[in-house]
Amino acid sequence: MIAKKEKNKTPKDSMTLLPCFYFVELPIVASSVVSLYFLELTDLFQPAKVGFQCHDRSLSMPYVETNEELIPLLMLLSLAFAAPAASIMVGEGMVYCLQSRLWGRGPGGVEGSINAGGCNFNSFLRRTVRFVGVHVFGLCATALVTDVIQLATGYHTPFFLTVCKPNYTLLGTSCEANPYITQDICSGHDTHAILSARKTFPSQHATLSAFAAVYVSMYFNSVISDATKLLKPILVFAFAIAAGVCGLTQITQYRSHPVDVYAGFLIGAGIAAYLACHAVGNFQAPPAEKVPTPAPAKDALRVLTQRGHESMYQQNKSVSTDELGPPGRLEGVPRPVAREKTSLGSLKRASVDVDLLAPRSPMGKEGMVTFSNTLPRVSTPSLDDPSRRHMTIHVPLDASRSRQLISEWKQKSLEGRGLGLPDEASPAHLRAPAEQVAEEEEEEEEEEEEEEEEEEEEEGPVPPSLYPTVQARPGLGPRVILPPRPGPQPLIHIPEEVVQAGAGLSPKSSASVRAKWLSMVEKGGGPVAVAPPQPRVANPPRLLQVIAMSKAAGGPKAETASSSSASSDSSQYRSPSDRDSASIVTIDAHAPHHPVVHLSAGSTPWEWKAKVVEGEGGYELGDLARGFRSSCKQPGIGPGSPVSDVDQEEPRFGAVATVNLATGEGLPPPGASEGALGAGSRESTLRRQVGALGEREVEAEAESYYRRMQARRYQD
């Protein structure tokens, strides 16, 4: 019965099975059988004639007729062939029936079927033919080896003189004078007996019986399971004892000498062991060919999305402080970072950490700083191209280039603010003051640029070799390394990714802003001289509006409590250099959910201005501009007054900007607010006190502030 698994399995095709069987194996076995016939049953080959001693008693043993032997030759051949062959067939049948369901589970399983010549040969048929065929060939080979040795040696059997009946008178001399006779002086009439008496070494019974016993015993040892503790030993001992009996009968019946039997045992056992190990592979099935399964591909999307926001803060120190790539990989022409377009469904919330580092310099707790934002993250494969994984952005520390970028940024914001509110919803008395303010801002910017150019010519050019190196890390965000610089000129890094107009202001919020302005105008009785809000980037104009309204109304004072966050205890960050001059200011245009962060001096931590305490006297803002002049001080502009780094050239770290809403001191110009407050400060909030605001009072206060600022610039 063939198992279902065997039936369902597709058989293999073999082109060499039948040709080898028909043209190689069968001819060899047939030739051995034919040779054995001529050697055993015919007198075509005569044994060698060997001399003997006169009246040798060892050769004068009684002769037992062939039909009187305990195990005649034909019986020996049949037993040596039939018993092992029957045992092999029965064993293969049992193995096929019991182990057919274990196909492919190990090297000892049943072999699969093979198609050859249009016929399907299952494992039982092929294994049986193979093992029995090798056994038959071994028997023939053993008999041939024995006959060849016997014919070559011609040793006499113990009954040689009995069947030869030598005639000593034919010698012409007496046995005493010549005891060793080499002539043929046999006078017996049984020529067949005389011929067989000349072939005794080795014993044919011993060789054939030993071969059969050893061959079938090795088969039992290989096929029968160890679960049967006694079956295997019983079968092995049975065949071994039978072989021993066959050999010993030759000694007891004086058919062979003891040495002939022992030699026959050795020859037969050696042939059997060789064929069992090398011809049939110790009766084991060949190992099944296992198709190598390809390694499962890494699911980059699954790995990337499983990295949550909390896991980024639990990484060890080695992960967050990986060294940058080799200089050869980072150097070269700046190239844009490739971005993959994926569906919104693959976006996951992850943490983007930015580390500000100063390489090869001592670490300080006060100088260590880091901040993180939670941004949507596009899932990308974990194994990126090295060219995409590392990038180098060279930003020259040229003041003119920085001013050019800032002016372009301001120009874009001014153009966007011109399209902020629809004409039908904006009254004329609100648009006219806005145009005046814009013109004043442009004039001030031109004057400031001229002054900065003159100062730059006096100071001299900045070395062009000071470039910050930014390495983009897919998992932990960009890492900025600041090379040391000799001069005090700061580097202003402005993100190139600008939020497009119309990306952050909803129709509801714009409508609410218009309604508040209309109500404020009705209460104040006159137009308000402020710039209209920028489309989508609404916080800078809204901040000016709130400050102006609060000053006019004389609302309650509020003072923010600054909370310093020094991340020196975190194992994920590295502190910058102790040198105050080598610093970098990064404006994050992607973080709409965090307040503005300013970089303090090397001995002071970062300060966040978020919490508002009611009942105090002013608004204390974070250091929005991050750079201040330290030479001269005007009355009304203290160390904490906000001066944007857009309008200043010399840095002064560690200051806090304070705006007194009651007196109007510290009010930043619109250009400074636009330069300092970009997309990164949209979410910073202030309590607004809406009150009546007079047009003349606002204009007078703004005019006085501008005059103080101009006087300070001229003094610097």
From Swiss-Prot:
Keywords: Glycoprotein, Membrane, Phosphoprotein, Transmembrane, Transmembrane helix. CDD domains: PAP2_wunen. It is a multi-pass membrane protein. The keyword Transmembrane helix applies. The modification Phosphoserine is found at residues 320, 351, 426, 506, 641. Coiled coil: none annotated. Glycans are attached at residues 167, 316. PANTHER family: LIPID PHOSPHATE PHOSPHATASE (PTHR10165), PHOSPHOLIPID PHOSPHATASE-RELATED PROTEIN TYPE 3 (PTHR10165:SF14). This is Phospholipid phosphatase-related protein type 3. It comes from Rattus norvegicus.
